Amino acid sequence: LKNILGGGFDLIKKAPTIEIGLARTPSWLGPRLSVALGLTVYNLEKYLKKSLHPTLGKTIGFRREFIAAQNCSTEGDLIDLILQSSCTPPFTPVMYRSGQAVLDGGLVDNVPIDGLSPSPQGAPKSEVLVLLTRRYSQPDYFVNELPGLRLTYIQPSSPVPISSWDYAHHELMPLTYRQGRADAGLAFSKGVFG
């Protein structure tokens, strides 16, 4: 991760707020059992219900927490936060934040719309662009309206070059970024945003 950040920590500190999502485990489960149960209910909901935004994890006690990258005081703190946000024992070591085990935020919902701030009532809706990493049974581009939010989803035109589990092939990240940018550019050129 230090190579990926490439000395850009100071730029991140000055950038618009970047919220990183963690999952707090149910109080009645340890971290390893939480991952097993979390992955099971997530995959059941994803493959059987085919839900874009799963809800079962929250029902059984997982809760999401968002932390601003800009709140990290050092590059090491940011690296720890990124690793905590993708913690999935036994595939990775158990990680703790403020003394409590934390897991990959995707165990709650891998499209973290619950961390968005809706516009106040009567104001124009906040526009949000969601670049998905896998295809769902939806059109290439679609919109979901929620109170105070207008979410525009863009599905990938082809499988993304890097897996969410792949920390070893950081050279694929720029390819993935370019694909997302190209897919969004195509959506813009087709008038998806208005």
Where are the predicted features?
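Patatin-like phospholipase
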Residues: 1-194
